[in-house]
């Protein structure tokens, strides 16, 4: 894959565990309640899942195809729903990955990085509308539709 920015992709690939840890820390900084909502075990699972996010981000940047991240986000959305992780938390995780990755790549690669992460965020926001993930239900409506 040499159609895109191979230098930026190589820098991301070399980031390794430190990049993933910084991405999770950045996500927790962006949303202070992130750590309260998720147990340590869930945060460790998200940290290991970030490896797949970074791999797909590397592919998207190396091939100059930001839609690769959108395809990946569409595939993993169901998995996170089953694990009861909200799509808003995945958007926050992507924003943390954006911050951590921007510190590693060269300034010329940031545009491709932003485009790929924006594609994933768009997909997660689309999936957010399903099953009331976007917001908490109103208590009165929850009482009325309790059987539904």
Protein language model features and the residues they cover:
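Core of compact, soluble alpha-helical bundle domains
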Residues: 1-91, 95, 99-148
């Amino acid at each position: 894959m040499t159609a895109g920015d191979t230098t930026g992709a190589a820098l991301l690939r070399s980031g390794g565990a430190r990049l993933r840890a910084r991405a999770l820390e950045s996500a927790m900084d962006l949303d202070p309640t992130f750590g309260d909502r998720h147990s340590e075990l869930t945060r460790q699972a998200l940290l290991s899942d970030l490896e797949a996010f970074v791999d797909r981000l590397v592919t998207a940047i190396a091939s100059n195809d930001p839609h690769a991240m959108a395809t990946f986000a569409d595939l993993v959305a169901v998995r996170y729903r089953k694990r009861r992780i909200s799509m808003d938390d995945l958007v926050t995780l992507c924003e943390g990955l954006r911050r951590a990755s921007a510190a590693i790549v060269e300034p010329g690669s940031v545009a491709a990085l932003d485009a790929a992460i924006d594609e994933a965020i768009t997909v997660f926001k689309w999936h957010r509308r399903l099953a009331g993930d976007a917001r908490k239900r109103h208590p009165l409506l929850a009482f009325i539709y309790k059987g539904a």
